[in-house]
Curated annotation (Swiss-Prot):
InterPro entries associated with the record: Glutathione-S-Trfase_C-like, Glutathione-S-Trfase_C_sf, Glutathione_S-Trfase, Glutathione_S-Trfase_N, GST_Zeta, GST_Zeta_C, GST_Zeta_N, Thioredoxin-like_sf
Any Pfam family the entry gives: GST_C_2
Taxonomic lineage of the native organism: Eukaryota, Metazoa, Ecdysozoa, Arthropoda, Hexapoda
Gene name in the database record: GstZ2
GO MF annotations, alphabetized: glutathione transferase activity; maleylacetoacetate isomerase activity
Name assigned to this protein: Probable maleylacetoacetate isomerase 2
Length: 227
């Protein structure tokens, strides 16, 4: 995809580049946040599968030493880690805020984000599942997603309105929807989590969320059902 780079352009004139993998929930969070804030960006696909994983090549290691996605080149800087990226976007592009003004609601958003991004997703991430092994990876992922979703559902029982925290979309929603997708991939029984399911259904038709969906990414395999 075009990056619109111009040698005479200032860093603020260069369109951001998001290094992304179509099914990466971490990349997905950032895509949602950028779409919600209406920030134009180009995607540079990084396959986590092809040739043993393009994230491990020397060229990409210079972009992200953690050899993971996402990475975002923006304002003359390269940022890694999805939550750090979302906070940067929130601080530099305050339009369509993803954190509430109320300090208690803001803390609740961060709580839900941490449960998902620290307590669930890293434990069912590709790099972990490779070490767990093919025979046990489904059971492993189900265990950690179920454990984490119990905590998320409990948090939502006191914080949710239309969305995770009240009636405005927040970073918590940006993180929840991709994690529900992961749960379905690993055939987690989601019936015990009615609030999670309701919020996921509410957001599935939102244009920013729909555009960020894996099936709408340039590197999504053409044979994927419902692409």
């Amino acid at each position: 995809m075009s990056t619109n780079l111009c040698p005479n352009a200032s860093s603020s004139d260069i369109q951001p580049i998001l290094y992304s993998y179509w099914r990466s929930s971490c990349s997905w969070r950032v895509r949602i946040a950028m779409n919600l804030k209406e920030i134009p960006y180009d995607i540079k696909p990084i396959s986590l599968i092809k040739s043993g994983g393009e994230q491990h090549c020397n060229e990409y290691r210079e972009v992200n030493p953690m050899e993971q996605v996402p990475a975002l080149q923006i304002d003359g800087h390269t940022l890694i880690e999805s939550v750090a990226i979302m906070h940067y976007l929130e601080e530099t592009r305050p339009q369509r805020p993803l954190l509430p003004q109320d300090v208690h609601k803001r803390a609740k958003v961060r709580e839900i984000v941490e449960i998902i991004c620290s307590g669930i997703q890293p434990l069912q991430n590709l790099i972990v599942l490779i070490h767990v092994g093919e025979e046990k990876k489904k059971e492993w992922a189900q265990h950690w997603i179920t454990r984490g979703f119990r905590a998320v559902e409990k948090a939502l029982s006191t914080s949710a309105g239309k969305y995770c925290v009240g009636d405005e979309i927040s970073m918590a929603d940006c993180c929840l929807v991709p994690q529900v997708f992961n749960a379905r991939r690993f055939h987690v029984d989601l019936r015990p989590y009615p609030i999670i399911l309701r919020i996921d259904r509410e957001l599935e038709s939102n244009p920013a969320f729909r555009a960020a969906h894996p099936s709408n990414q340039p590197d999504c395999p053409p044979e994927l059902p419902n692409k």
